[in-house]
Swiss-Prot record:
Main location: cytoplasm
Cofactor note text: Binds 1 Mg(2+) ion per subunit. May bind a second metal ion at a regulatory site, or after substrate binding.
Full protein name: Ribonuclease H
Enzyme class at the top of the EC tree: hydrolase
Gene Ontology molecular function terms on file: magnesium ion binding; nucleic acid binding; RNA-DNA hybrid ribonuclease activity
Record PANTHER family: RIBONUCLEASE H1
Domain (RNase H type-1): residue spans on this chain: 1-143
Compartments in which it is found: Cytoplasm
Catalytic function, reaction form: Endonucleolytic cleavage to 5'-phosphomonoester
Signal peptide: none
């Protein structure tokens, strides 16, 4: 099983507002950078999109070390999602899960695509080179949708 290290990040100028996502994928000596954005979005949606796009870029099941600065995504996929699914995609308070279509896509990629994923939280803007690069790519995604 190929080993891949992934760093992801999302950015939003205003929340909601124009946003971007970025991902850095490394396997051995190979490195791939991905980014994109949307005009009307939120930071949490962009954090989710970064992980979805990164995992979606993998061509076969991999052993993944995934680094992200979003506790929302890390806790959502490792802790909260099981309860949401049991409750028909509702929160503990009975409210519909926000960004449900993205959570469902991430669930499919994370749990049904055959990947073995270790989820690692890193503090954002704390000098981690992979996180800083993903942040730069996310901001590039914002600039792209703004036509700059």
């Amino acid at each position: 099983m190929n080993q891949v290290v992934i760093y992801t990040d999302g950015a939003c100028k205003g929340n909601p507002g124009p946003g971007g996502w970025g991902a850095v994928l490394r396997s051995g000596t190979l490195e791939k950078e991905l980014f994109g954005g949307e005009l009307g979005t939120t930071n949490n949606r962009m954090e989710l999109m970064a992980v979805i796009q990164a995992l979606g870029a993998l061509k076969r099941p991999c052993q993944v070390a995934l680094y992200l600065d979003s506790q929302y995504v890390r806790q959502g996929i490792t802790e909260w999602i099981h309860g949401w699914k049991k409750k028909g995609w509702r929160t503990a308070a009975g409210q519909p899960v926000k960004n449900v279509e993205l959570w469902q896509r991430l669930d499919e990629l994370a749990h049904q695509a055959g990947h073995r994923i270790e989820w690692h939280w890193v503090r954002g803007h704390a000098g981690d080179p992979g996180n800083e690069r993903a942040d730069m790519l996310a901001n590039k995604g914002v600039e792209q949708v703004l036509g700059r």
